[in-house]
Amino acid sequence: MASVIIVGTQWGDEGKGKIVDYLAENCEYVVRSQGGSNAGHTVVVDNIKYKLRLLPSGILHKDKVCVIGNGVVIEPKVFLSEIDSLIEKKVNISNLKISDRAHVLMPYHKILDELQEEDLGENKLGTTKNGIGPCYMDKSSRLGIRIVDLMNKETFAKKLKFNVELKNKLLKKLYNHDGVNYDELLKEYLGYAEKLRPFVADTTTILNKAIKEKKNILFEGAQATMLDLDHGTYPFVTSSYPAAGGACTGSGVGPRKIDNVIGVVKAYATRVGEGPFPSELFDDVGQFIRDKGGEYGTVTGRARRCGWLDACVVKYASYVNGLDSIAITRLDILDELDKLKICVAYKYNSEILEGYPADLDILSKVEPVYEEFEGWKTSTRDIREYDKLPENAKKYLKRLSEVIETDISIVSVGAGRDETIIVKKIF
């Protein structure tokens, strides 16, 4: 029996969905514990590409119980659309559970998100405008509507009326917006309620019973450590807690029940939206990586900023999450490069920094200290054993492991489920 957390170590888009999909084969439960429809992940199974935003990647395994935990904010329209899409592809959804404690994302959250981002002007955060921040704001302000509230017509109507009146004051007086219609929202969301009802459950009890029964559980992170509300490059972060601790608070499973934490590391670095990115590339190499890796957002379609692998970021993520090992993804994207670099330290005012700076002014001015490596100039796509990787690829991976002081357990050399090298057994 093992409970394993999969967490992103960079700014998201590391390939967590691929790793979760691969490891889910050995699990009975797969859990999503935070974030919302702002977190896209792509999984390829039998050459069929699945793009998911709310549903755990484990849903692609017909015999797994997939749980959306209390820490997730759920937009019913997106959730039901994903369900319909999977049903069309003959994916079994009968084992899907939604926490009755999860919060409901409403249309006024999306409107506020967009208006607030526009209002920030040059200080914009680069939000996906999916309403995630305003929804978590309502949750923290104790104004939110939970799934359990949506299941009770009278409770939902009362809470919705209060929220609509409050939000319309804000929308009309501050943003000169027409506001939202209570009756229309009530009718729309009560319709969603009946479609959601079969999936709603006390997932905290379900998961803790599964642990007592010695089931294997995989906690699937969304976004990543550097987007964590506390530990990321604040304020250019998300509104939830993608670090390993968030898997516990977002699912109702205590930290002492976790056996293993695996950090997913893309073999290069990418970032979407605003914020410091010390190892960012602005040359032809950066464009090559973007094009070869298809580095465009699953949710927004925005081009991702690309750069060299930043070991300072990953080492910091190892500290924050207490990583037991790392899973390297997208190594194959680097197959054609003549030279590669890893940022192993930051220099500021001619001094090497210890730790990862919280001050974004400093972070935006640091000079990356690089170590250069020879490329391997051959395809890694068909390799399934670590020892059979090109020598230069192994040197690159070994040095990363040394700098971040964390072992490698998995290497992914393609998007397919089978394009995976297991270095250290997880389950």
UniProtKB/Swiss-Prot annotation:
Catalytic activity: IMP + L-aspartate + GTP = N(6)-(1,2-dicarboxyethyl)-AMP + GDP + phosphate + 2 H(+)
Subcellular location: Cytoplasm
GO CC term (a single one): cytoplasm
Subunit composition and interactions: Homodimer.
Residues annotated to bind Mg(2+): 13, 40
Cofactor: record remark: Binds 1 Mg(2+) ion per subunit.
Pfam families per record: Adenylsucc_synt
Pathway as given in its UniProt record: Purine metabolism; AMP biosynthesis via de novo pathway; AMP from IMP: step 1/2
Keywords attached to this entry: Cytoplasm, GTP-binding, Ligase, Magnesium, Metal-binding, Nucleotide-binding, Purine biosynthesis
Cofactor(s) of this protein: Mg(2+)
Residues holding GTP: 12-18, 40-42, 304, 330-332, 412-414
SUPFAM superfamilies for this protein: P-loop containing nucleoside triphosphate hydrolases (SSF52540)
GO biological process terms held by the UniProt record: 'de novo' AMP biosynthetic process; IMP metabolic process
EC code(s) of this entry: 6.3.4.4
Active-site residues annotated for this sequence: 13 (proton acceptor), 41 (proton donor)
Record-listed IMP binding positions: 13-16, 38-41, 128, 142, 223, 238, 302
Similarity comment: family membership: Belongs to the adenylosuccinate synthetase family.
Protein name as catalogued: Adenylosuccinate synthetase
Binding site for substrate: 298-304
InterPro entries for this protein: Adenylosuccin_syn_GTP-bd, Adenylosuccin_syn_Lys_AS, Adenylosuccinate_synth_dom1, Adenylosuccinate_synth_dom2, Adenylosuccinate_synth_dom3, Adenylosuccinate_synthetase, P-loop_NTPase
Record-level Gene Ontology MF annotations: adenylosuccinate synthase activity; GTP binding; magnesium ion binding
